[in-house]
Amino acid sequence: MISSKPRLVVPYGLKTLLEGISRAVLKTNPSDINQFAAAYFQELTMYRGNTTVDIKDLVKQFHQIKVEKWSEGTTPQKKLECLKEPEKTSVESKVPTQMEKSTDTDEDNVTRTEYSDKTTQFPSVYAEPGAEQTEAVGDSSSKPATPKATTPPSSPPPTAVSPEFAYVPADPAQLAAQMLGKVSSIHSDQSDVLMVDVATSMPVVIEEVPSSEAAEDVMVAAPLVCSGKVLEVQVVSQTSVHVDLGSQPKENEAEQSTASSVPLQDEQEPPAYDQAPEVTLQADIEVMSTVHISSVYNDVPVIEGVVYIEQLPEQIVTPFTDQVACLKENEQSPPVSPKSVVEKTTSGISKKSVESVELAQLEENAKYSSVYVEAEAAALLSDTSLKGQPEVPAQLLDAEGAVKIGSEKSLHLEVGITSIVSDNTGQEESGENSVPQEMEGKPVLSGEAAEAVHSGTSVKSSSGPFPPAPEGLTAPEIEPEGEATAE
C-alpha cells in the first residue's frame, strides 16, 4: 500500500549547521538572537574561505576555534557593531551637518576638515606678476576656495585692479581689447602723433590751440598685399611752417638765399624730425596739402587713393573715407615775411627711415601780395634708408617739378602739396624784387639699386583770388640740375 503524503528530503549539512548555531547561542547567550545568527554565519563563511572541507568538519573546527573565544567574552555581535560604527562615522564626516549657532565657533572652523567634490576653475584674479597660479581639479587635500574667489568677476576694468595684481580675462576678445587698451594708454601722452586708420576710423574733431609753434604729424596705415601676405606700412609725415616777423634788408635776404642754395652733400643721415621754430600768427595763411598714396608691386598698382585733410582756424576736422580726405590749414601770419615749408616722411612699423627732404624755402619782400606754392612728391619706401642730397637749380617762377624715388619691392607714395599765402592788402607783385627758389635733390638708395631720382618744387606768384585745389596728381616732370641763381 502506497502512502499519499509527500516525502521531504533534508539537504546535507542542514542538521549540522542548525546544531552548531544552537550550541553557539546556548554558550554565548546573546541579547539579539537574529543579529547573532547573522554574525555567526558571516564568521563561518569567512573562516571557510575557498577551502573544500566537509560541512561537519568545518562546523566542528569553527566551534573549537571561534565559538570558544566568544563564550569567554568577545561575541560576534560586538564585533559586528565595532565594524559598523567606523563605517557610520566615515559616512557622516562626508555629509555636512547643520550645527547650532551657539556651539559654532571660529576655533571649531579652524580645526574642521572640509571636503569638496566639485572644483570650478576661473581666471586667477589675484595672480602675482611673473607667476601663474593654477588650481588642481579633484585635489581633496586643499581647502575649497571661498565663494568670493569661486564666483567669476563680471569683467572688471583693468584700472580697477591694483598695480600688484593683473587680471587676465578668459575671453580672447576681452584679452585683445585689454592689450589694445594698454598700448593706447602707453601712447596716450604722445599728443603730437595721430594714428588714423583710413578704412575704419570715424571723423575726428580736435581743438586747435593757438601757439607759437605749428607742427602736425599724420600717420596713415595702408595694407599692402605681396605674394599672398598682407603687410602694413605706416607713413608718418610732419609738416612745419616757419614764419619770421619783421622785414629784413636785401642783404640779409641775399645771404639767406645763398645759404639755402648750398646742397646738403656732407650730411648722409639728416635727423628725422627737426624742431619747428616759433611762429607768431597775425595774418591769414592758407595751406592746402594733397597726399596721394598708391602701392605698386612688380610695376602693377595694387592700392590707390587720395587723402585730403582739412584744417579750420579753431578746429581740425578730419573726415575719412576709403579713398578721400582733405587737409586745409588756416593760420595767421604777417603779409610779408620769409617762409619755409619742410615735409618729412618716415616709416614707423618696420623702423625704416626716409630721410627728410626740404621741398621749398621762399623769401619775399614786403611788397609781395601772395605766393602760390605747388609741389608734388612720389616716393618708394624700400628696405634701406633713403639719403637726400638736394640741389637748388635756377628756374623761373612758373616752373614745376616733382620728387620721385623708385624701388622694386616697396610701397609707392605720391604726395602733392599746394601752399597758398594770401594778403589782405592786395598789393601787386613786383618782378624786380622777386626771389625765386627751387630745389632739386637726388635721394640715394642704400642697398638695392633703384630708379632714377629727381625732385623739384614749383613756385607760382599771383595777386588775384586763390587758385582752385588740384583735383589729382599730374605726371612728374624731370628737370635738369643746376645751381641756384636769384633773378
Curated annotation (Swiss-Prot):
GO terms under biological process: sperm capacitation
Biased composition, class Basic and acidic residues, residue ranges: 78-91, 101-117
UniProt superkingdom: Eukaryota
Protein name listed in UniProt: Calcium-binding tyrosine phosphorylation-regulated protein
UniProt KW keywords: Calcium, Cell projection, Cilium, Cytoplasm, Cytoskeleton, Flagellum, Metal-binding, Phosphoprotein
Annotated compartments: Cytoplasm; Cytoplasm, Cytoskeleton; Cell projection, Cilium, Flagellum
Task of the protein: May function as a regulator of both motility- and head-associated functions such as capacitation and the acrosome reaction. May bind calcium in vitro.
Alphabetized Pfam families for the sequence: RIIa
Predominant localisation class: cytoplasm
A GO term, aspect molecular function: calcium ion binding
Gene: CABYR
Residue ranges with Low complexity bias: 140-152
Polar residues biased stretches: 420-436, 455-464
CDD domains: DD_CABYR_SP17 (cd12100)
Processing and modification events after translation: Phosphorylated on tyrosine residues during in vitro capacitation. Dephosphorylation affects its ability to bind calcium.
Compositional bias segments (type: Acidic residues): 478-487
Subunit structure: Interacts with FSCB.
Residue ranges occupied by any RIIa domain in the UniProt entry: 12-49
InterPro entries xref list: CABYR (IPR038848), cAMP_dep_PK_reg_su_I/II_a/b (IPR003117), DD_CABYR_SP17 (IPR047579)
Chain residue ranges for the region called Disordered: 78-163, 243-271, 420-487
A GO-annotated cellular component: cytoplasm
